[in-house]
């Protein structure tokens, strides 16, 4: 999975897809009551990027619905995963449940259209900190209460704050999640980061019966050297400001026989076995 990073403007969707991304990540900004308002990262952000692009969240979902619906004039077959970077760290922790209800409702109304839409992308809920775990409970409660639990098949969760992997596992156990789990490891592209935690996450992914890391990806990689380093470790995905660079690296002799771009037929909730 090549994940285009911080794709918050509508015009950026095609831009990142044209560069080779098959997944996009966008930031969800909330008001103080936990209502998802806009796609927006804000300052500071990655070096060399404009931090202020934004779109009304519901408009973004309406647009991306077209882009991920087969037969639609805007359809782009390669876009198979949407990663929602939920900026829950900016709101009171007691509003995490309200935020989960709101995001689930907006996906139901504007992306899935309560069963009418044929939009097919998988959804990854990127949660910054384990303290915001009530978001997951609320999201699942909302789908159940509204009678749309079938969409759980399309949704996964991922904690992005580089917290202790055992703490993440405990929180997932608390909310009853033991499948559809990704694990991110990384840092803003302005800095370098070691590989100790990433290596541990990959080790757990490869442990039979471990259900709290089906896929592991590294972010936000901009240097060819760090892309190669992560691929050598065996990551499932790379998040980058430059998807075209990842595409280039994947074509190199060292990696061409080991990796390929994920397609819609690849289940993001299953561990890859060669």
From Swiss-Prot:
Disulfide bridge map = 45-51, 47-190
MF terms (GO), sorted A to Z:
lyase activity; metal ion binding; phosphoric diester hydrolase activity; toxin activity
Q: Which cofactor does it need?
A: Mg(2+)
Q: Which GO terms describe its cellular component?
A: extracellular region
UniProt note on tissues of expression? Expressed by the venom gland.
GO BP term, pick one: lipid catabolic process
Q: Which InterPro entries match?
A: PLC-like_Pdiesterase_TIM-brl (IPR017946)
This enzyme's EC code(s) = 4.6.1.-
Q: How is the cofactor bound?
A: Binds 1 Mg(2+) ion per subunit.
This chain belongs to the protein called Dermonecrotic toxin SaSicTox-betaIIB1
Protein's organism: Sicarius albospinosus (Six-eyed crab spider)
